[in-house]
A protein has these predicted regions:
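Conserved catalytic core of nucleotide-sugar-dependent glycosyltransferases
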Residues: 96-192
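Short beta-strand-to-loop acidic/aromatic patch adjacent to the donor-nucleotide binding site
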Residues: 85-96
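A conserved hydrophobic helix/loop-capping motif in glycosyltransferases and polysaccharide synthases
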Residues: 2-11
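Short, high-confidence coil segments that cap the C-terminus of an alpha-helix
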Residues: 83-85, 113-116, 200
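Active-site-proximal specificity loops/subdomain of glycosyltransferases
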Residues: 35-86
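Short, well-formed alpha-helical segments that are part of the catalytic scaffolds
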Residues: 11-25
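C-terminal catalytic/acceptor-binding lobe
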Residues: 176-256
């Protein structure tokens, strides 16, 4: 079973439309919602499998945004529900699956990899000129956190991956759930590095599948561009920021 956890701050009607779309496209998948918007908007969301994320670490400067509370709350949610997934997938609200077999391809890819964690651009960033690594390579709090838990020969090794689209085996999620991850550290560095030092194996989606070829930082995808792309059967796209066009996009995907 795959649990797919979505992070959103959008208005309630937008969130409910997205969760209905996902449930229709992937009926064999179990969905939940981590909501980081206003509490009063959270209360308006009709989708029942939701949890509120009030942690300030979700907000603030991009290089210090920490989504650990979302990952940990997802683990707490499925345990409360008595659900035992073997895989957990984490996407932001601007990540749009485009095919009904998207989740099957997620499973096929991680099984082909043999890894515990897959992410976009997932790699060892140590001694590279990658921006997030340069920002954190001498960060005493991060390095102390990693050294305290590391089973690796080099506790200063730093891994990174795009926060959107992370796919983990349940054992990896469980290893993060009851751990103090409250550092002011970017998710894209903190989560992969923590899992690496705990002894888990990490890999890059693109090494085993084309499922994330439609995932990028920028520019955002536009509806007209997706009209041309969808006949070529891409698996997903990120980022799609045009909230007003989401209903039309959902219709386009579901009728193909």
């Amino acid at each position: 079973m795959i649990v797919h956890s979505v992070l959103s701050h959008h208005p309630a009607h937008v969130v409910d439309a997205m969760m209905r779309f996902l449930g229709t496209l992937g009926p064999q998948t179990v969905f939940c919602l981590g909501y980081g918007g206003p509490r009063e908007e959270f209360d308006r969301i009709a989708f029942p499998e939701k949890f509120f994320l009030g942690d300030p670490s979700l907000r603030g400067r991009i290089e210090e945004q920490n989504f650990s509370c979302w990952i940990q709350a997802t683990g707490a949610w499925y345990r409360r529900r008595g659900i035992e997934p073997d895989l957990v997938h984490f996407t932001e609200n601007d990540h749009i699956p485009l095919r009904a077999d998207y989740w099957e391809e997620l499973r096929r890819t991680i099984e082909a990899s043999g890894r515990d964690f897959l992410g976009k651009w997932c790699m060892d960033r140590t001694n590279t000129n990658e921006q997030s690594y340069l920002h954190y390579r001498d960060d005493a709090r991060l390095l102390g956190h990693l050294a305290a838990l590391s089973v690796r020969s080099d506790p200063r090794t730093i891994w990174g991956a795009l926060a959107d689209g992370m796919l983990m085996r349940r054992t990896a999620v469980e290893a993060l759930t009851n751990r103090d991850l409250s550092l002011p550290c970017f998710t894209e560095i903190l989560i992969p590095s923590t899992l690496h030092h705990l002894g888990f194996t990490l890999g890059d989606f693109d090494a085993w599948s084309g499922i994330f070829r439609g995932v990028r930082h920028r520019p955002a995808f536009a509806l007209d561009g997706l009209r041309e792309m969808i006949p070529t059967k891409p698996w997903c796209c990120h980022p799609f920021k045009d909230v007003g066009s989401l209903p039309e996009l959902y219709e386009l995907i579901l009728r193909k």
